Structures are given as C-alpha cells and as structure tokens.
A protein has these predicted regions:
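ATP/NTP phosphate-donor binding region
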Residues: 1-16, 26, 30-31, 35
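Polar, low-complexity loop segments and adjacent catalytic/binding residues used for recognizing
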Residues: 22
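Glycine/Thr-rich phosphate-binding loops of Rossmann-like dinucleotide-binding domains
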Residues: 26, 52, 157-158
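Short amphipathic alpha-helical segments
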Residues: 29-32, 54-56, 161-162
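Catalytic core of DAGKc-family lipid kinases
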Residues: 34-150
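Internal anion-binding site segments
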Residues: 137, 144-173
Length: 173
C-alpha cells in the first residue's frame, strides 16, 4: 500500500482510495505524507476495527462509503510520525503494538475487534517497563513506563477520553 501511494503521489494522481483497516490506511499515509504532491485520500473501511474511518465519520457500510465518496468535500487531518512511520490515529510503546500486530487473521475473522481486546489484556499482564523521555511544550517526562499512547484524537478505541481534539496537538497517555 505504501509503494502504491508513493507512485500515486509521484504520478500526481488526483486521489488515492484505500480499502482496508487502520494498518493499511497508515501505510498509505506513510506513502504520501512527505511528498511534494499529496493526492486526496478516500478511505473505504475494510478492516476489523476501522477506528480511523469511525473517527472521520465515514460510513461503515462498504457500499455506503463508496456512494458517499466526494473529493469536492475534503478535510485535513492530523498525522503523526514516529521514526520513519506515519500514523493517523495512534502510536504506542509497550506490549500493546505487539499484541495488536500478533492477532491471528482467523481470530479477527471469528471474533472481530474482540480478538484485539483479548490479546491486549494478555499483553497488559506482562510487567515490561521501558525507559522513556517525552518532550512537550508543557514540560518533559523522563522515567519508566510500561505503556505510552500518543493519540491524534479524543477517542481511544471507541471511548471518548478527551474533549474535542482538532487543535493540531497529540494527546499522550
């Protein structure tokens, strides 16, 4: 998906439409983020959780999302960067990313988003601690943490945890 998005940017396509989940959307964002020309991005939800499309209030029905695609009505969204990877919703440190990455396709198909919750709960039980340094405009933190979540929204999963967050800043948990 990243290479396709890079090519679309290089060839100056008007738009890129991605069908997939949050991981696929992040791959496309990584492919167009720092380009001289950035095509418009349309997203058709095709993953398990589809949190990015839910946060953007995109119709969760595939046919409905396709019918509602309108590249004359666009919004800018915040994106984040960690090392060389971009993200459109969340970046995390700790056992959470591995737990999410290691969910088996069969489990996602059978249990849906619950498969992520089960793996996440298993991972939280490990007491692995990381030395971290977080620098913000409001102060710095140097110390240990088992998990760090950087959110570009006011939601975590489907739970609202902050007031509106369209300010260009990330929330750190």
């Amino acid at each position: 998906a990243t290479h396709f998005a890079e090519e679309a940017s290089r060839e100056q396509y008007d738009a890129v439409v991605v069908f997939g989940g949050d991981g696929t959307v992040n791959e496309v964002i990584s492919g167009i983020a720092e380009r001289d020309y950035i095509p418009k991005l349309g997203i058709i939800p095709g993953g398990t959780g589809n949190l990015i499309t839910k946060l953007l209030e995109i119709n969760q029905d595939i046919d409905g999302a396709i019918d509602e695609l309108d590249f004359n009505l666009t919004n800018k969204i915040d994106i984040g960067k960690a090392n060389d990877n971009y993200f459109g919703y969340i970046f995390s440190i700790g056992s959470l990313p591995e737990a999410i990455h290691n969910v088996e396709i069969e489990d996602k198909t059978k249990f849906g988003i619950l498969a992520y919750a089960v793996n996440t709960m298993k991972s939280v039980m490990t007491d692995q601690v990381f030395n971290i340094k977080v620098e913000t405009e409001n102060g710095n933190y140097v110390g240990e943490a088992s998990h760090v979540l950087v959110l570009l929204t006011n939601y975590f999963a489907d739970k609202k945890i902050f007031e509106e967050n369209k300010d260009g800043y990330a929330n750190i948990l």
